[in-house]
Amino acid sequence: MDKPDTTLKIRTLGRFSIYVDGKLFTTDWPSETVQQFFCSLLSPLDLYITWDRLCRSTLETPVSPTARRGLEELYIMPLNTFLIKEFGFNPLIASDKGIGINHSRIDLDAFNFNSTVLDGLKLLSLGSQQAAFDKFNKAKELYSGSYLPGMPGKIIANTRKELDSIYRIANKAVIDEV
């Protein structure tokens, strides 16, 4: 059952919380591993995460038909069922290459932060210093802490490290401007 008006606001910087149409989502996840898998897919560093990367990070094996089936059975099917039941739609997009999140109905703080810093770097490379520093200041406002603090997982840990590094770049640019 698709609820076309449902929107999600997902906070991953400094904490993990989901708001459904403005209300805090408090239902229990099917399992910690399904929640962790979903959070891995929220990484703003890639449009999608390849099947090989997912298999290696969650099952610790290269992609194969058996590994893909394992991902489907252990993570994707329970997650799809949960998302449709709780949110009224499934924001996952799967292809032959991998799986990602459809951002059209999701406001994801880490995605907004990452995009804002990248826009600032692009503006800086084009010589638009003031516009770039405005973007970096906006990014500083968006960054409310480390990505999914305390949440385990290889993709999450790599994303956390990368976003912390990007934050330091934006912060240094703002400090250097002052």
Q: Can you name each region flagged by the protein language model?
A:
Residues 1-178:
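Intrinsically disordered, low-complexity protein-interaction/activation regions
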